[in-house]
Amino acid sequence: SAVQKITNLLGGHGDYRLIVLAPSSVQEMHDFAALSFELSDKYRNPVMILSDGRIGQMMEPLTLSDRKPRTVEKDWALTGAKDREPNTIRSFYMEPGTLEETNKRIQKKLKEIEAEEVRYESFQMEDAEVMFVAYGTSARLCKGVIRELRGEGIRTGLLRPISLWPFPSEIIRELSDKIKSIFVVEMNAGQMVEDVRLACRDRVPVHFHGRMGGGVPTTEEIITQLKQTL
């Protein structure tokens, strides 16, 4: 799917994924920098912080935490110690079947990441009939839209994926049984809407609004388009 294609930005033809974190504030830009190192050390897997341009240019107060890095046992790392056991790190094995077994171990690790590292934020979803799904700047805009629509008696809420991989498919599927429709907002032509449709499995209609070329959706246009779907 589209967002999962983004996770393979480093190129290559192997069966792998990157952990992808999508910040929605300056605070999260700071926090995710530390988190990404912890996750990459824990799983020996690359992590991408996928921020849009608006977040990158934003000025906000943030709290610098006293967070101490988690120590992770890394038996694969070189220590430089005298008389240590030799440790050769390779990604390609010529022996028949060896590379496939290595790839099976990687797939097992990716399944563990999918089970343990899904991150998302739920906003006013307790009684929502329409669910926005958005990340980054688009998610911030949707919160303002939700407050305005609720003032008009239209019950809306937001599911914000924080991890674009692993994607919060299961929670989207569960919430799809409780709502009437989904409205995806992005600052592109629709890179996540495909994942949302796959997650909800045709339980409810999925609508989309996006702006391209650095354009930012406005509250007015989101509300206008959403009302056309009701």
Set out the residue ranges of the language-model regions.
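Short, solvent-exposed amphipathic alpha-helical segments in soluble enzyme
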Residues: 34-39, 64-67, 144-155, 173-177, ...
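Conformationally flexible catalytic loops at phosphate/diphosphate-handling active centers
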Residues: 44-122
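Redox- and metal-dependent alpha/beta enzyme cores, enriched for Fe-S-associated oxidoreductases
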Residues: 119-155, 159, 165-171
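Peripheral docking tails and interdomain loops at the edges
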Residues: 186-230
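Conserved thiamine diphosphate
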Residues: 1-52
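Glycine-rich beta-alpha junction loops
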Residues: 51-57, 136-138, 189, 213
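Short acidic, glycine/serine/threonine-rich loops at helix termini
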Residues: 1-2, 31-34, 58-65, 144, ...
